[in-house]
Structures are given as structure tokens and as C-alpha cells.
Amino acid sequence: CMDRNGNGRIETSQDANGNNLIDRGNPNEFFGQNDECYAWTKAIGRSGGTARALAIDAGDAQNPYGNVWVGMYTHREFYGVQGGDGTLIQRQGLQNPISIGHSPYGAVVDSNGYVWSGTLSGGTIVGFDSSTGRASGVIRPQGVPARSYGFTLDGENRLWVGAQSNGVNRYDPYHDANGNPIQDPLAGGGEWRNSSCGGHRCYMRGAGADAEGRIWFADNTTGMIGYRVDTMQLIGQFSIGGGTTGAGVDFNGFIWGVASGGYTGRIDPNNPNDVRRVTVGSGPYTYSDFTGFGLRNFTAPRGGYKMIIEGCEKLDTDWMTLNAEATLPPQTSIEFRAKVAESRDILSDPGLRAYGPWTMSADGPTEIPADLAG
């Protein structure tokens, strides 16, 4: 978020009256394009392209928070845009947009920078190299149901597909059915596997993998279904009601299901009896990595650490400088941010100004120590 008007606060859409809704007709709650947490808004692609797939990569020197790949369902192509300002990515040898062989409906970027997309109903997968634009052919299901909806990946770069009423499919572009490595993941020939819904009626849609070796699918009939990512063994079903289209993992390990009936449900996978449901408004809909957990754990692993430092108890404290020391492996970096407030309660205010970021990099100059007095 950026303080564009320089008033020392972040002005972003919020629930000002405490009724658990953001009223789009109330200018004190909904800021529209003046929301300072909107980085940019761009029209992507040709008219009628129908954007139905979006994934964020690990970024580059110019866009360290990631670049965005937008898949056009009707025109069967992907546009790569810079995360910083939404302009088209321009690289030597990269033709942008990138033509692919099917209609993308959901996309992910793996840890090696390959962009993968599923499609609606047919079960096919197509990938391409985000650096060069070199694309695979259409990878068709082998020995598994040719059905698809939601699309995600796990920590081993295996691709998962919600196979509608036929459970879930998994495709490994890096290993064949005998476990042998595949040198070129775009060449095809990877292992396909399927796991059923355990005899239950189901309709599998969006999905998200957690950090504990499990993957969670939105079951449109009852709620959520979990599997082990390595064995594809079914863990169980969790009822939050019908109409669930999206499944996501948050950074505290809870599993969230988004239901088109106007609510979201939260599951504690370590306590199956702790299932909560909250009304959120009319027709919420998603089937992708809506929490960013997959991006920050599988595509571009990152972590965070927060620390509160208190000033002198009996005297006023002026915070002047932020300094730090770190041991960094090659090609890694740390970003520092700081907030200053009169009390701990004020620190939690989302509108409080954040200083920074300042970067300490293993491969380049450092911006630490940093000035807090400005």
C-alpha cells in the first residue's frame, strides 16, 4: 500500500461501522480506484479474450514481488505483465502474448518458473517457460478421468486437478510412472494418477495445498475434502454446506472454503470438530490461490518475522535508526519494514504508516542501516 496523498495514513476500503460488510455505496467504507492498496488497474489482452487464469511468478530484479501471467480462455493465450505497473513483459526472445493449445481455466507457476494451466472440463494441461515462452503441447489425461475444474500445485511441483464428480487427478511433469526423472518438464510423459472421493458423491472444484503434506479440495456438494499429497490417500470430508467453489490455506494453517451461497467456512485440520461458517455477502466465487499461501510456500518461498521493541518506560523515546546483521545464502535477501507508535494497540492499526522497505541482499548493496527520523 502507498500513501499517495501524503496524509500519513493508508486509506483503504474497510468496515467502518462494524457490520462485517464493506458497503460499496458508502464512500467512508469503499474507496474504489482511490484505494491506496490498489497498485494499478489495467485492461489485458484483446476484446473478448475472457481472462480466466491468473498466476504470479517469483519476480525479477525490476519486480521483486512477482510478475503476473493472465490466461485468456477464448483466445488461448497468456499475457505476461510486470507486477510493478502492469506493462507487458519484454524480454529478448519472448513473444508476448504466448499462444497455447487449450483454453486456460486456472494457472500456477512452479518453483522452476514454468507456468501451468488447466482447463474447464477436458482435463488437459499446458505449460510454458516464463523466461522464453517455449510451450508444451497439450498434455492429455492418461488412465485417469478426462474431467477438470480447479487447478493447483503442491510442494513437489506436482499439478492437481479437481476432476469434478471423479475425485482428483494429479500430474507430475518431472517424473514418469516409474519414478524416473524427466529432464524437460514440457516434453510430456509425466505420471498421471487419480483418487476418488471415497465412495461419496462429490463435485471437485478449487484446491490448495498446505505445509503439512495435505491438499484440500472444494467439494461443491458438501464442503471440503482432504488428501495426502504423496499417497493421494483421502483424509476425510468436512461439511460446511453446498456450493463450495474455492479452497485456500491461510498462514496459520486453517483451511478456508468459499461458497457461492454467500458464506465462507473455516476448518481446523487438527481439530475436525472446529468448523466455522460466516456470512460474507452475495455470491463469492474463487477457485485459485486466494490467500497467496501457494505463491509464498511453493512458487517463491518466503517467510516473515515480527518483533516489537519497546522504548524507555519513564522517558520519551525517539526512534532514529534501524540496524541489523544477517547471514544470507546466495541469491537471497531480507526486506525490513518498521512502524512507530505510542502504544501496542496503535501498532495494529492497518492505516499506520510503515517505513521502508529496506533491503539487505546477499548479492548486492545493502540499505541497512536505515533512517527512521525522516
Where are these regions (language model features)?
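Short loop/turn segments that connect beta-strands within beta-propeller blades
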Residues: 82-86, 128-134, 172-177, 228-233, ...
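Eukaryotic tandem repeat interaction scaffolds
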Residues: 146-237
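A short beta-strand motif characteristic of beta-propeller blades
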Residues: 33-45, 87-98, 134-142, 179-198, ...
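Beta-strand-rich ligand- or partner-binding modules
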Residues: 251, 259-261, 266-374
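Conserved beta-propeller blade signature
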Residues: 63-71, 79, 114-118, 158-162, ...
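Short loop/turn segments immediately following the C-termini of beta-strands
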Residues: 59, 73-75, 119-122, 156, ...
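Repeated scaffold domains used in trafficking and secretory/extracellular systems
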Residues: 34-59, 99-110, 144-156, 198-210, ...
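Acidic, glycine-anchored loop motifs typical of Ca2+
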Residues: 1-34, 181
